[in-house]
Amino acid sequence: MKLHFFNARILSMEEGMEITMGEVWTEGTRILYAGPSATKQEICRKLQREDLEFNREIDCDGDLLMPGFKNAHTHSGMTALRSYADDLPLNEWLNEQIFPVEAKMTPEDIYELSRLAILEYLTSGVTAVFDMYLTPESIARSFEDMGMRCVQVSALNNFSQSLELMEE
């Protein structure tokens, strides 16, 4: 899919992070061009291409176009449990409410709940996550099926005792 975003305020991650008016050209998952507006011929010349036909052209109407956010701490399969008994202290919430519910969840439940989480991430501008949760195979499959980037991280904690009693 070849996309042409134009009439956009572009925030690059270059030093100074200035916002400039311009356009972005993409092909598949690659950004071909991000910069000031110019004629198609001028940009094709910069890209060393004869021509480029777009599948879709999107007028951003002056809206901000920027790189996607990365969420470095997610539990995708538990997104739907976020507000479940959320008025309790953390350890009580986890031990008495969340862990018993999670014990009943199947890998397929976690797969479907992860897909729901991915939709939430995308509506928030998140394009990649670091996820740590049960049944990593289900999580990986959901991200692969939805076409989103995910790094699986193993747990580095032990909730079986209080923080005061844990050894470093």
Predicted regions and their residues:
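Divalent metal-coordination and catalytic microenvironments
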Residues: A8, V24, T29, G62, ...
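N-terminal metal-binding scaffold of metallo-dependent hydrolase/deaminase domains
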Residues: M1-K46
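Active-site gating loops and adjacent loop-to-helix segments of metal-dependent hydrolytic enzymes
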Residues: A80-E112, M146, V151-E168
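Active-site-proximal flexible loops/turns
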Residues: E14, G68, M78-R82, M132, ...
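Divalent metal-dependent hydrolysis catalytic cores, especially in the metallo-beta-lactamase
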Residues: S114-S162
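Residues that scaffold the ATP/ADP-binding catalytic core of kinase and kinase-like folds
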Residues: M13, A34, T79-A80, W93
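Conserved beta-strand termini and adjacent loop/short-helix elements that scaffold enzyme active sites
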Residues: A34, C60-D61, V153
